[in-house]
Amino acid sequence: MRSFANSIGKPEQGCINEDAVIAQENIIAVSDGAGGGGLFAERWSAYLLNHLPATPISSADELDAWIGDIWEPYYNQCETDARILGGLSLDKFYDEGSFATLVAVWRLSDTECQWMSFGDSVAFHYNYRTKQLEHSFGTLADFDKP
């Protein structure tokens, strides 16, 4: 199976594309950097996807453990870069950090996938047999949940 992923940024001039996507043999994922708060959202999005585990994240505890294992090198590099940018950027980084949503789908076999999402990014799956479009949110009302 051949995979392809592309993230198209907003057309405004000077607008940073804060989103990241991957499509590999057994995983597809999207991370939507939330640039309205914090710094380096585009970096955090890419970092999350580049450090996804090979096996599915199945619980909040597993998500916390995974983030706990990967965050420090990212933080240290961004802290250094914010320091170079100056005091206001460093203060903003300390106060707000970086934000991004995440949705990932792991292919477990030819007939089974497992997905997880954090935030409001959504994975869609079209079931050819049932002709139903499935998604990682149960209902549209789920978007109103914190």
Question: Which residues are covered by each model-predicted region?
Answer:
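PP2C/PPM-type serine/threonine phosphatase catalytic domain
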Residues: 1-146
